[in-house]
A protein has these predicted regions:
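Lumenal/extracellular "mature" regions of secretory-pathway glycan-modifying transferases
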Residues: 1-13, 17-18, 25-87
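Residue-level recognition of conserved structural "scaffold" positions that shape functional pockets
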Residues: 18-21, 142
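Secretory-pathway luminal glycosyltransferase catalytic domains
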Residues: 48-150
């Protein structure tokens, strides 16, 4: 079974195209299953934006409810554990759970709006959740012809 690359979609059509493109490039180069999270950002979008890639011939499936639950559980656990670590200084116990419960799973957030080469060299042995806008064509330039066909 291949590792999964889950890409969080957010914003309008232009942003979604960039997010899909980085996901497609990483999944293509690392033989990963591409999954699009078209749900978590659009629940309470103040601009009423929606998933807009359904008119394209994309090569990805949409995220399931179970996958969303796992991602949110991990995200919330990490937020709470950071607060506990800072306030109480308890980190050995929490690190044990992080390593044993989530070692197969990695959430990557965009650090800045500029190109980050490290993102293209991510581990293909883990399921990965990408969260960011990824607005540089450098992320997907190598598969430009594939994207144009889609």
């Amino acid at each position: 079974m291949h590792s999964k690359l889950i890409v969080k979609l957010m914003g309008g059509l232009g942003n979604q195209l960039f997010q899909y493109a980085i996901g497609r490039a990483i999944s293509e180069n690392n033989n990963m299953e591409l999954v699009l999270d078209n749900k978590t950002s659009y629940k309470n979008d103040k601009y009423k934006r929606v998933y807009s890639l359904n008119n394209f011939k994309i090569k990805a499936r949409l995220i399931s409810r179970e996958e969303i639950k796992r991602i949110l559980w991990k995200h919330n656990f990490e937020r709470v554990s950071r607060v506990i670590e800072r306030r109480l200084g308890i980190n050995t116990f929490i690190n044990y759970f992080r390593i044993n419960l989530f070692s197969h799973y990695l959430i990557i957030k965009e650090k800045s709006l500029s190109f980050d080469r490290e993102i293209l060299n991510i581990s293909k042995n883990k399921d990965i959740y990408l969260n960011g806008y990824w607005g540089s064509e450098k992320y997907f330039y190598d598969i430009k012809s594939i994207l144009q066909e889609e």
